[in-house]
Amino acid sequence: MTYKIKYLPLAVQDLNNIARYLSGFYPKTASRVLKELREKITKLGDTPKMCEVYHLDPAYRRMVVDQYLVFYLVNDEIKTVEVHRVLRGAWNLPQYLE
């Protein structure tokens, strides 16, 4: 069963910030990383529970893509994956998920 992928505004902002940052230093890397992030997130539509539950907040699931972490919620009732944040793994994550 296919789930709809919904990007929350903060997740869109995160992706735009990643693109802007990487484009300033590594233009080719920026397009590759964004393509990889979008492709992996799209796969959640077919297998939304393929990633682990985030240990600090079990409401979220966490997908690792290169050096980034995608935090999302699965709503089985309306068959939707809500992408909440896309963050660098090196950041202090709990403060970004509040």
Where are the regions that the model predicts?
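Enriched for short, Lys/Arg-rich terminal
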Residues: L73-E98
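Short acidic-hydrophobic surface loop/beta-edge motif
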Residues: R61-V65
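Basic, Lys/Arg-enriched alpha-helical interface segments
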Residues: M1-L56, Y60
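Histidine-centered metal-chelating micro-motifs
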Residues: L69-V70
